[in-house]
Amino acid sequence: VPAKLTVSRLYPEILDETAAAEADSVGESAVVFDDEAPAPGFISGKSGVRGSDIGSATHVFMQFCDFERFARDGAEDELCRLTDDGFISRKMAEIVDIRALERFRESTFFGRMRRAVRMEREFRFNSARAAKDFTADPELKKLLEESGTELIVQGVVDAVFEEADKTLVLVDYKTDRFTREQLRDSAECERILTERHSNQLTYYRDICGEIFGRKIDETYIYSLSLGREILIY
């Protein structure tokens, strides 16, 4: 039975934190990395609304919205439709960040997405990766290489789309929130997002490139808090 490890972000040294627990089963089990975040507080019944709850609710809208309806009718009307159709609970709908969604709707990046000739949204993948690539420990790396241990990396990419000129673009929506002081320096906010998520997006880019049979030309974060895209690669 494969061992499972759930983490919020993938990074190259993750096995160094779990090496002791996995040492007895090297070569016999796989470790599953799952980047999907746990349910927010309002879903699990906890009282109070946190910034992360607002971000999670807004991300659910992005997951299920119909782009053409959203573009034509606006965020509030599309949110009502998603609520009526059961995609979003009424409690969740109350805390969706409408202003952030309207900024996205009016952005040039959303225009690019709507003009795409191919669009894969909520693109789920499972990929076997060499375990040796997830440790900086020379001895553990050698042991894992000799044993041929693999990790099953699971993930969900928000969108991969192809433009008319064949450019293949990957985008991951991020709802990280910033303090007022941080928001005064947009370059610093971009640096924080890039530093926080670039490892995860490297895996996404490489794995999606393998699945699509060609390299991803551009990899972006779209920050709902900042209201713009950030080119990572």
Stretch-by-stretch model annotation:
Residues 1-233:
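Structural signature of nuclease core domains in nucleic-acid processing machines
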